[in-house]
Amino acid sequence: MKSFTDLQEGLYDPNIFKAFFLAGGPGSGKSYVVKKSTGGTGLKIVNSDDVFEKYLKQAKLDFKMDANQGKQRDVLRTKAKKVTAKRKDNYLEGRLGLVIDGTGKDFNKISSQAAGLRQLGYDTHMIFVNTTLEVALQRNKERDRTVPEKIAIDSWKQVQSNVGKLQSLFGPKNFIIVDNDMPDTDGKLFDHVFKKVQGLLRKKVDNFIAKAWMAKELRLKQR
């Protein structure tokens, strides 16, 4: 039987009750940023795009959004979202640490999601990946799965218009901006971001809801 200390260390793992929202438009380099800034932390990534792209490859469909394949893609996208939602529910059941990938263009959706997580006892944070429009459009062209330029431009503008509101929602201390225009050749940028993420992960969750859940789990494990 595990000791009280062993049980307590598991429940007080720094990644439990931590949620990082990821924001940035198409071509911002979010996937690369999240890999560099949260890799090795054990945070669970919630991203339906990864699942969707896997399904596209399996079905041998074009990543360039061929209009003739629209119906097939829609079916796979719906399936990917359902699978991702199920995974997220499983993560939430164990109150595991999360990275919720998104663009940041729908402020109300993010606000609602953050509120729901806080009601479960989560500390919520945001990593905002920022680029100029020119860089975003160029990177979008270079991606395997591109989006039409007009959609990329509209998305970039919507995301930029939400920066202030998002910073207010999460608070300055929980809002990390990554200026990702230039290649991080010396590694200093991502080292700085990684340290910020680590600092937030090390901070113990100190709200009543999380403490009550952990106390309950501890009692169950001691039976």
What residues fall within each predicted segment?
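Proteolytic processing junctions in secreted/extracellular precursors
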Residues: 2-10
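Phosphate-binding P-loop
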Residues: 10-17, 90-93
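Short hydrophobic/aromatic beta-strand immediately N-terminal to the Walker A/P-loop
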Residues: 19-21
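The conserved Walker
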Residues: 25-26
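Conserved substrate/cofactor phosphate-moiety recognition/catalytic segment
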Residues: 31-96, 108
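Acidic, metal-coordinating catalytic cores used for nucleic-acid/nucleotide bond scission
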Residues: 101-110
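Conserved phosphate-donor/acceptor-positioning beta-strand/loop module used by diverse small-molecule
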Residues: 105, 118-139
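Conserved GTP-binding G-domain of TRAFAC-class P-loop NTPases and closely related GTPase folds
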Residues: 133-223
